[in-house]
A protein has these predicted regions:
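RNase H-like polynucleotidyl transferase catalytic core
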Residues: 13, 70-75, 149-170, 184-185
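Conserved short alpha-helical interface segments
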Residues: 1-22, 44, 50-53
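Extended, low-complexity cationic-aromatic segments
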Residues: 25-113
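Short coil/turn segments at beta-strand junctions that form active-site/ligand-binding loops
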Residues: 42-43, 126-129
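Short, basic/hydrophobic alpha-helical segments
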Residues: 108-127
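Short, solvent-exposed loop/turn segments at secondary-structure junctions
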Residues: 3-5, 16, 51-54, 88-92, ...
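RNase H-like two-metal-ion nuclease catalytic core shared by retroviral integrases
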Residues: 133-135, 142, 157-180, 189
Length: 190
């Protein structure tokens, strides 16, 4: 069939990645052991992460004729949308959307708003919740840590390259697998 349609593909090279360095493996193992311990003690894990959306079609490649382009036409979103998400082990999800770049101040604002929402939805939540965060600079910043401490919530950072243990990454992956604006509504200020 490939020959009939004049299709071809390129074999991808395997890249050497730091994900399997001894340090990364040990840190992931320690992180995994700590997570299992918290789950055994019925801690609620709240995965907080962020992404941004600058287009509505995330389909990157398509089959094409040998001399044709395999790229798809992108549908831009301008200005881009920043999304901060929190999802807990019970499946509750909280979103914040903005046009601002995510930084320590935006993370602090999100955490304050999140705890206000959780005060009404989950009384006594701070006794049982641990925030799981990746190692982004604004997650590690002193400002963010001070806010989390002031809110009385525990914090754990994931091990390096631990995407598969962060449920927010799966949520973002599901969002970014296809066309999120199938009706092609306007997505720019112009």
């Amino acid at each position: 069939m490939k020959k009939e349609l004049h299709l071809s593909f390129l074999k991808a090279k395997k890249l050497n990645h730091q994900a399997n360095s001894e340090r990364a493996l040990i840190l992931r193992q320690q992180y995994g052991m700590k997570m299992l311990e918290m789950l055994q003690h019925n801690r609620r894990i709240l995965n907080v992460d962020e992404t941004w959306v600058n287009e509505t079609s995330f389909i990157r490649r398509a089959w094409a004729k040998r001399d044709g382009s395999g790229n798809t036409i992108l549908s831009r979103v301008s200005p881009r949308i920043s999304m901060i998400t929190a999802i807990d082990t019970d499946g509750r999800v909280w979103f914040a959307l903005s046009h601002a770049n995510t930084d320590s101040k935006m993370m602090a604002l999100f955490l304050h708003s999140l705890t206000e929402a959780m005060d009404t939805e989950i009384p006594g939540y701070s006794d049982s919740i641990t925030i799981l965060s990746d190692n982004a600079k604004y997650h590690q910043s002193q400002e963010t840590r001070d806010v989390i401490k002031a809110l009385g919530i525990r914090l754990i950072f994931s091990g390096p390259y631990s995407y598969s243990s962060a449920v927010a990454e799966y949520l973002f992956g599901g969002l970014k697998t296809s066309e999120i604006n199938p009706d092609h509504l306007p997505t720019t200020k112009r």
